[in-house]
């Protein structure tokens, strides 16, 4: 069943001779529970694509459907609710609040949405993240890999249908990178959440169900990984 559909997506910065076409007529769809890796060189349009899918940046033209809704027909208030409740964003930089402990950083999206954390859900999430004994630690008391686990927890606390990860292992060593990808894959499988991950690492991309290659704002390949 389809969760995401991107139709004729274009994004242009500037105008005239100085215009930069970050995305040029991009179209594809992703099924519920699918794990898709998006690869391409720096400046190819990968991050722009992810931000538009997540409702963070607006397209110049084209449409993005998530679970049947064209998200760019929503007003600002409804689009903000969509971002909070339907999308989990994970970045290369952890963006944790330094004065909040692990538990507080993870549950922050719920509080911003005027909802109370469910203790059983939080305990299960902390356990899966391997952070149960770190729940009261501040970010500066954690390793880079542990901080990225917190950012993953923060992205997952709302049980989003769509997880978007932009180079989530970019600041980590090889072991921590492998652990993070395994963790994302585990959540993808356990909760049947759709995962779109940007990476420069070919070995990481091969762990996905499918690889989409982008260059100069266009899809150059779209292939299913056969195992």
Show where each model-derived region lies.
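H-loop (His-switch) and adjacent beta-strand-loop-beta switch element
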Residues: 211-223
């Amino acid at each position: 069943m389809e969760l995401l559909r991107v139709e004729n997506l274009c994004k242009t910065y500037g105008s005239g001779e100085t215009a930069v076409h970050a995305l040029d007529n991009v179209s594809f769809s992703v099924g519920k529970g699918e794990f898709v890796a998006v690869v391409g060189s720096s400046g190819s349009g990968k991050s722009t694509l992810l931000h538009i899918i997540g409702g963070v940046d607006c397209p110049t033209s084209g449409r993005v459907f998530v679970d049947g809704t064209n998200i760019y027909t929503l007003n600002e208030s409804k689009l903000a609710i969509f971002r909070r409740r339907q999308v989990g964003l994970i970045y290369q930089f952890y963006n944790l609040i330094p004065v909040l402990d692990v538990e507080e950083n993870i549950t922050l999206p719920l509080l911003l949405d005027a909802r109370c954390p469910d203790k059983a859900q939080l305990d299960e999430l902390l356990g899966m993240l391997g952070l149960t004994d770190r729940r009261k630690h501040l970010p500066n008391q954690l390793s880079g890999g542990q901080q990225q686990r917190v950012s993953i927890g923060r992205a997952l606390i709302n049980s989003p249908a769509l997880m978007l990860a932009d180079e989530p292992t970019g600041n980590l060593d090889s072991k921590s990178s492998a652990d993070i990808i395994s963790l994302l894959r585990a959540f993808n499988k356990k909760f049947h959440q759709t995962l779109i991950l940007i990476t420069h690492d070919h070995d990481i991309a091969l762990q996905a169900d499918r690889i989409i290659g982008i260059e100069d704002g266009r899809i150059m390949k779209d292939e299913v990984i056969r195992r």
